[in-house]
């Protein structure tokens, strides 16, 4: 399955929630109407969605939120299922500790997609070593830094400036002057997207 390259706001409308696929420079309210499904007039409400339909929709929502394709998403779920603890929460934590997401959370990218692109272009180091793998798992104590040659990139500077205004998660510490951040700890469930029902995803893969 190829990566979706169409209008990002359309995906948020389809899921009925902000998937944070667009920059926070504009509020989502000005970008699309979440209560209106894609289509010229929006899809009319029909019969009640089945349990399977709800489970599938939740999986699609999380995949789109993190920009993950099906095969890779299944691998993340399998890894989460192998670990001790709540499988759904572990799945979200694995996704949150991806390097492209951490770059986004630290404010170096305005969206996860931009963070992924910057990582692939070798704009960052992790503990002093250049890493260009978006799925690289960041660990507590790791230092993610913008490379010297990338520090003047307008999109990074603007994204960081905006992030400073909005605020960053408590589980990262960012030095804006040095343009580097420390991954302090794996976020608790309460610090991850609230508008996700991960138990539905667990139910789907447990069928």
UniProtKB/Swiss-Prot annotation:
Alphabetical list of Pfam families matching this protein: Ribosomal_S4, S4
UniProt keyword list: Ribonucleoprotein, Ribosomal protein, RNA-binding, rRNA-binding
Stretches assigned to the S4 RNA-binding domain: 97-157
Signal peptide start-end: none
Disordered, as annotated region: 31-56
Entries under SUPFAM superfamilies matching the protein: Alpha-L RNA-binding motif
CDD domains noted in UniProt: S4
Keyword hit for Ribosomal protein: yes
Biological process according to GO: ribosomal small subunit biogenesis; translation
GO-annotated molecular function: rRNA binding; structural constituent of ribosome
PROSITE patterns named among the record's database cross-references: S4 (PS50889)
Bias kind Polar residues: ranges: 42-53
Cellular component annotations (GO), alphabetically ordered: small ribosomal subunit
Assembly mode: Part of the 30S ribosomal subunit. Contacts protein S5. The interaction surface between S4 and S5 is involved in control of translational fidelity.
Protein family: Belongs to the universal ribosomal protein uS4 family.
Known function: One of the primary rRNA binding proteins, it binds directly to 16S rRNA where it nucleates assembly of the body of the 30S subunit. With S5 and S12 plays an important role in translational accuracy.
Name assigned to this protein: Small ribosomal subunit protein uS4
Species annotation: Herminiimonas arsenicoxydans
Biological classification of the source: Bacteria, Pseudomonadati, Pseudomonadota, Betaproteobacteria, Burkholderiales
Gene: rpsD
